[in-house]
Amino acid sequence: DPSVSLAGIGGAAMEAAGVQLVQAIGRFDVIGMVGPLALASLVYRFLFMRRLFHSEPWDAVVFIDHPGLNLRYAYFAKAAGLRVVYYIAPQIWAWRPQRMHWIKQRVDHVLVILPFEKALYDEAGVPCTFVGHPLLDAVAPRYDPVSLRAQFRLPLEGRVIALLPGSRRREVQMLLPMLLEAASQLARR
C-alpha cells in the first residue's frame, strides 16, 4: 500500500524493503558486554526509544522478536498512546510464562509464527493472528536429504543435528564452543 510509510530501527534488509531507518540496528548490539559500558548502552537505548515514540505522529509500533528489550519498549509505546503489534511473539510456552501479564498490558495484537501459539494467546485473551513462519517462505529446499547426506559424507540413516550458534559474530564466539562441546558429548553416547 503506497499510502503506508514505514520507519524503524533495522538493518539492510529492512531498508531494502522500504523501511526508512531512524537508526541502524548495529547501534543497539551489545551482545556479551558487561559492566558500565553495557549499562550506558541500555540507558541510551531506553531514552532513544522513549523519545522516538513521542517524536512523530506514529499510528502503530511493530516490535519484532527480542522480548527481553521489546516488552520494555512496548511499555514506553503504550505510555505514548501508540497501538502496539508484536511479530514473532515471546515464546511464553518455552520459558518465563509469567510474561503473559506484560503482554496483555502492553501489546494490542500479537502475530505468531507457530500454529499452536495462537491457542495460547487466545486462551489468555490476547488478540492474536497466526501468520506462519518467515523461513518457510524465505528458504526453499534446494537439495533432497539423500544428496545433502552424500555431500557432507553423512550416513543415509540416523538423525542429523545442526549447530546454529547465532547470526552475530559475538554470539558465535560465545555460543559455538558450548555447542561443540555438547555435540562432542552427544557423539560419545
Annotate each language-model stretch with its function:
Residues 1-149, 164-175:
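Active-site and donor-binding regions of nucleotide-sugar-utilizing enzymes
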Residues 174-189:
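Short hydrophobic signal-anchor/transmembrane segments that target glycosyltransferases
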